[in-house]
């Protein structure tokens, strides 16, 4: 649980913040948010090339000057903000491998830069080479269908006599909401192909940045909870599709019913969201797919 609490929710926040500022044409603030996101997890850096391209108006005069400004905003600024998150390590004397360069051969490159580069290379080697088998590993292909949610905690007991009890914290989204959002993503892609409006473009950009890069690391051990950064854009996709459905004349009562069903589904799964002890049979009834166990 600590990994999600300490990292992923803040990564998601800064990605959303960067997206909001980009949409509002506040590029400096968007770049700062990207740097902060990258400081939480390197996957935040995926925003840099995408947002850089989005921010450039290629049909506008003064392209060279515009490029210089955008490069400063979306490349240099995120790097500086990212480096600022390392200040605690930089100004320490006993951080991990802080004095690594002292034991190496002499170089014209300052020891501080060599130490920092070494630390980053070690991080990169660890994460790209992380292929240990794990019972809850989940390939990105399965994330959109809730193929293998991560169990953070499970405990069984005999307190519910004559039957046993189960207590679990399962990192899973509200199934009805998640599956509806996945379907809406496919619909959004279709609508974008038909009419490339700003909203659908922004939603799909968010999905591309937060989801597709994971497919380049097929041999790496990955988990479903990495999808937490995708979830805001999936929800936006669902809201977008609902909005388009209302514009096309669908009755609001159907939407209200759908929202109500999602709420009921959320309440039903709440015990496994927060680790409430329930009868084993009740827990088993909530394991809709065998891969959830």
Regions found by a protein language model. Give the residues of each.
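Aromatic-rich transmembrane-lumenal/periplasmic boundary elements in polytopic membrane proteins
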Residues: 79-142, 146, 279-287
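Short acidic/glycine- and proline-prone juxtamembrane loop motifs at membrane-interface regions
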Residues: 3-10
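Transmembrane-helix signature of polytopic, lipid-linked glycan biosynthesis machinery
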Residues: 207-222
């Amino acid at each position: 649980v600590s990994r999600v609490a300490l990292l992923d929710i803040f990564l998601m926040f800064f990605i959303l913040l960067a997206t909001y500022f980009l949409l509002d044409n506040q590029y400096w603030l968007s770049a700062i948010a990207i740097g902060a996101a990258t400081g939480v997890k390197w996957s935040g850096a995926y925003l840099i090339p995408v947002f850089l391209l989005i921010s450039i108006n290629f049909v506008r005069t003064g392209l060279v000057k515009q490029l210089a400004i955008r490069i400063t905003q979306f490349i240099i600024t995120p790097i500086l903000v990212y480096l600022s998150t390392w200040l605690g390590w930089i100004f320490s004397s006993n951080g991990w491998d802080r004095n690594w360069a002292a034991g190496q051969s002499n170089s014209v490159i300052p020891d501080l830069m060599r130490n920092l580069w070494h630390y980053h290379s070690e991080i990169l080697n660890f994460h790209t080479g992380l292929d240990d088998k794990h019972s809850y590993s989940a390939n990105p292909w399965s994330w959109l269908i809730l193929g293998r949610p991560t169990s953070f905690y499970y405990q069984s007991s005999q307190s519910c006599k004559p039957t046993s009890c189960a207590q679990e914290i399962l990192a899973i989204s509200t199934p009805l909401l998640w599956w509806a959002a996945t379907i809406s993503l496919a619909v959004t892609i279709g609508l974008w192909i038909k009419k490339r409006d700003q909203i659908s473009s922004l939603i799909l950009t968010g999905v591309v940045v937060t989801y597709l890069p994971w497919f380049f690391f097929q041999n790496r051990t990955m988990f479903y909870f990495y999808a937490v950064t995708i979830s805001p854009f999936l929800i936006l996709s669902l809201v977008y599709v609902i909005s388009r459905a209302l514009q096309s004349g669908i009755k609001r009562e159907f939407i209200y019913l759908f929202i109500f069903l999602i709420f009921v589904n959320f309440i039903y799964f709440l015990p496994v969201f927060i680790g409430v002890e329930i009868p084993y049979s009740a827990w088993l009834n909530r394991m809709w797919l065998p891969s959830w166990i």
